[in-house]
Amino acid sequence: MPTDNTSIAAFIDALPKVELHVHLVGSASVPTVLELARRHPDGPVPVDERELRAFYEFRDFPHFAEVYESVSSLVRTPEDVGTLVSGVARDLAAQNVRYVELTVTPYTHQRAGMPMPAVTEALDLAAREARDRLGIRVAYIFDIPGEFGADGARGTLDHALRHPPEALVGFGIGGIEQCRPPHRDAFRDAFAAARAAGLRSLPHAGEMTGPETIWEALEGLGAERIGHGTSCLDDPRLVAHLRETQLPLEVCPTSNVCTGQVADLAAHPLPRMLEEGLFVTLNSDDPPMFNTTLTGEYRVAAEAFGLGRAELASLARNAVEASSLDGEGRKAVIADIDALG
């Protein structure tokens, strides 16, 4: 007879999922990086699989930054961008992820000298192939690298408005939150233009900084969802506002531990966020680099936070409701979640 642990694990594996907070470069698995490393053998990444797996094992945040930058240096052509998307889609489809909003930082591709129309073509082709071959729908969020200030904002907006992929649904900002205040007006202007063009405002906020960054995302950027948002609990007024509006929060527990935002899973605020009645979704952020997966995040929610089937299914439904899936797509995924009982 299966134990409760094996039963919940099987339930999580079978659970239809939606991923809202995952970065393209940070999602590159070892097989995908190995393909890129062999394509560009002059890069800083080992071309031996065993050495690459050792290089990929998470140690600390500085090492994560080194791995991330090393992988980024291998993304040199539109073909490389398409290879990344295809690899991420394959990994997610294997976890029963039906839909993903994949965060792309086009400004880094611009700085690498890639022709932006060709990058868009690669994104479109990879999304179509993922849907046709794997049954997973891939949408995109274009993300300003906040540390590049006004130049990053203008470059990201330019690509979003002039060369948008077919499945571009959102406009975001990531990077080092502490770098944002001097460029606040440029970011506000870029988000206003993106919203006017029909893109959803989906910024990171409240991960590395306090509630003030979340307030700025809400009031200055018109946020419809918040990436991370874990510091909201430090401001009772903000908690009340988020509870009243049910604005979705993209929570990434393993990432928060790995980046040092919380000491360990026992200290993670997700259980309290749920107790406060906040609208929480589970996400993986940079999964291979943090030794996790979206399925793994649901297991963390069960094992570390004590959530049962009904609560896990509720988190899965939240992700569907917070997504940019069309009405029929939402109904289909929710029906499959409900069918698990």
Residues of each region from the PLM?
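Catalytic glutamate of the conserved HExxH
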Residues: 205
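Metal-cofactor-binding active-site regions of metalloenzymes
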Residues: 1-199, 208-213, 220, 224-225, ...
